[in-house]
């Protein structure tokens, strides 16, 4: 029942508009808020030509004309009522899809990348795909959850790498390969409404200003953005995951502190059992069961979105095959092999190992420290350790740096000779 004005006629109120939208035989149950795209959808046939589910200006004209039959003429109030009704009737298409799946009990995750792309059937490949699928599921059920992993398929053109990710997204509108830059002011618009974002040929990472920008982008859990009809910006929690495809062997951005976010999986079309597009219907049915298997794991709660220590070690070994050459690290390693001194500092390495005549910028000394820290940790640099306190260097002043690790002297009777400092600390009367 619509409220009436004192002088007769229907009141032009938001509530009256809501009542019509909820009860009119054409409009009822047709307007819903899509929680994935954060747009309003029309989900029923409306009696006029439409090209997609998202509410358009043309749809608004037809709805306004329909509202006039009830004596409601305020476009502003109708628009407000539409947002209220849509919000009260929200849905999430990917959650609905995943919740409707029934797993047939056949394990496919461990085999899928070999079947379609000829990847190795090993534990790292299986674990990488499993974590990627679980991360994608968690992102839609818990938007903004922490998930930094990027599954990267590496192999020749025509193998079906992009097609795999497109079909994995289930619907084409849930997939995008349109992300070219990570510093795009409209990056939320690029991500909005998509589940799987492919970085084709790793263009976005290649265009990044630094490895820090890449790491920061992949680690983000939200974007702050104002969509057109809103007055204030709001946090938009990420619901997508990122995938990479490339045919370059040296695609991994150089990161001396570790590339844990990038999971390279080599593929070989010649080893694949089927091409993913040979029979698309069969491939889609297989992928439905991939997600069903992943949902079974997700619902059990018995999973982690990180690799075990053993798998992390296997990943680091795998990543070495895809690293860009670190020429500066090589120059520093070579310098230390021939160097006869007992101490070095970053300024010394900048000048003497890398051959620079100017003073280093802060980021350049930081890069040298990263090379030394990583080299000592991974065994590329042996016999050196960071000294605990800053020391004076003749040409470079007081600096923190590194010193040779000296073996303790052992006499013929097997006793270790103590330094004067060690003896004093132990209280011996010398």
Question: What kind of feature is each model-predicted range?
Answer:
Residues 196-218, 252-258:
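Conserved AAA+/SF3 P-loop NTPase catalytic/coupling segment centered on the Walker-B
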Residues 187-192, 227-245:
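AAA+/SF3 P-loop NTPase mechanochemical coupling elements
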Residues 193-195, 221, 238-241, 257-262:
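Short glycine-/polar-rich loops that comprise or flank the Walker A/P-loop
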Residues 82-192, 347:
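P-loop NTPase catalytic core of nucleic-acid-dependent motor ATPases
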Residues 1-108, 123-127, 358-363, 374, ...:
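N-terminal nucleic-acid engagement/recognition segments and initiation subdomains in replication
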């Amino acid at each position: 029942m619509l409220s009436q004005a004192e002088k007769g006629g229907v009141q032009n109120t938001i509530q009256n508009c809501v009542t019509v939208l909820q009860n009119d035989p054409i409009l009822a149950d047709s307007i819903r808020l899509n929680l994935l795209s954060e747009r309003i959808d029309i989900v029923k046939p409306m009696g006029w030509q439409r090209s997609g589910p998202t509410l358009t200006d043309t749809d608004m004209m037809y709805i306004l004309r329909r509202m006039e039959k009830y004596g409601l003429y305020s476009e502003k109030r109708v628009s407000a009522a539409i947002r209220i009704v849509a919000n009260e009737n929200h849905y999430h298409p990917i959650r609905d899809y995943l919740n409707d799946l029934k797993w047939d009990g056949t394990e496919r995750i461990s085999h899928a990348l070999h079947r379609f792309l000829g990847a190795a059937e090993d534990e790292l490949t299986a674990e990488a795909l499993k974590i990627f699928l679980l991360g994608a599921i968690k992102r839609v059920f818990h938007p903004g959850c922490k998930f930094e992993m990027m599954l990267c398929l590496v192999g020749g053109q025509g193998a079906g790498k992009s097609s795999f990710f497109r079909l994995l997204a289930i619907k084409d509108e849930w997939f995008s390969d349109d992300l070219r830059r990570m510093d795009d002011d409209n990056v939320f618009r690029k991500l909005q409404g998509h589940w799987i974002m492919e970085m084709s040929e790793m263009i976005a990472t290649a265009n990044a200003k630094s490895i820090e920008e890449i790491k920061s982008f992949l680690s983000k859990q939200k974007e702050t953005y104002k969509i057109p009809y809103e007055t204030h910006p709001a946090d938009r929690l990420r619901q997508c995951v990122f995938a990479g495809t490339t045919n370059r062997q040296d695609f991994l951005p150089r990161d001396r502190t570790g590339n844990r976010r990038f999971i390279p999986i080599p593929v070989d079309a010649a080893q694949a059992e089927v091409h993913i597009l040979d029979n698309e219907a069969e491939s889609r049915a297989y992928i439905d069961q991939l997600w069903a298997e992943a949902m079974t794991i997700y619902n059990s709660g018995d999973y982690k979105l990180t690799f075990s220590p053993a798998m992390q070690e296997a990943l680091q070994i795998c990543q070495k095959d895809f690293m860009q050459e670190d020429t500066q690290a090589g120059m520093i390693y070579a310098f230390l092999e021939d160097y006869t001194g007992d101490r070095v500092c970053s300024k010394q390495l900048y000048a003497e190992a890398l051959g620079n005549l100017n003073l280093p910028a802060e980021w350049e000394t930081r890069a040298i420290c990263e090379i030394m820290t990583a080299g000592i940790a991974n065994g590329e640099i042996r016999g050196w350790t960071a000294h605990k306190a800053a020391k004076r260097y003749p040409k470079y002043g007081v600096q923190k740096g590194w010193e040779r690790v000296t073996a303790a002297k052992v006499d013929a009777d097997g006793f270790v000779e103590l330094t004067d400092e060690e003896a004093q600390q132990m209280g011996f009367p010398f």
